[in-house]
Amino acid sequence: MNRQPDVADSPQTTRLDGRLSERLTGFAYRLGWKLICRVPEPWASWAFTTAADVAWRRQGPKVQVLEANLRRVLSYSDASPDVDGKELRALSRAALRSYARYWLEVFRLPVIPIARIMSGMHVNPAGEAALFANLKAGRGVIIALPHMGNFEQAGAWVVARGAGSFTTVAERLRPESVYEAFVRFREGLGMEVLPLTGGHSPFGILAQRLRAGRLVCLVSDRDLKETGVEVEMFGQQARIAATAALAVQTGAALLPVATWFEGPDWGAHIYEEIPVPESGTRGEKIVAMSQQLARVFEAAIAEHPADWHMLQRVFIADLDPARLPASRQADP
């Protein structure tokens, strides 16, 4: 006897369930944002650290991806394919706690005094001078960062330090209300936020801003649109964002930057500019600059591995073949 379709199986019901789930998620984010700003910081810190430890013990899919990435860091740094399991687990726990601190600070950033952001930020003087010298001269600057430390706090610092504002790109989160909340949050810090998808191509707008002598900040250690550049990082092939294409297109200064946590404070290193090669095709220049960028990221991550919050696959060997360009897929 055939089973009659249940109302719960209908497409209409599925769509309703999806919309309800998104609304509840959006409500939870907005409520959490308001509550965390009101809870005493030590209590909030304890709650976020505890949540990180629970996730670490459960060792779900995201934690497994994080550990796979960190395994490559340890293996390369130790020059050995054999990684001590206890060392890896200890590092992944520290990384999840660092990631939890990032989110706690994101939620609380609107109530952190500017004076605290300025006094707690430790930046190498030479890099800081180079960044603002370029901007003062009217030359556009691209800051390219890995997912390390608290780059949102670093953004608040660079605005307060005198950059005025900068432009960045954000992935569209679901539900839309959460994405809009993050856009408003970043705009409140002095950022112009462009959507990665669902709007005009961000590349053209970013190029306009750079030609106007503005600052652009992009997290660049992951290929978000499957149009990135293949590089070697930690002895493995990986795909990172083609941020270097903006420098080739506009002549803007490409400055790698790494951020990390220093006790209760924050550290940042602004590296020397990666120049556009004098010879080669446009594509060859982008690849060469991207490889240099990957080398800087590699060194920064190796120095502060617990502050690399990479819970997504970046290494070619770990990627789903369906996500690779046709030129990278194995022949049948």
Region roles according to the model:
Residues 2-142, 190:
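Membrane-anchoring hydrophobic helices of lipid-metabolizing enzymes
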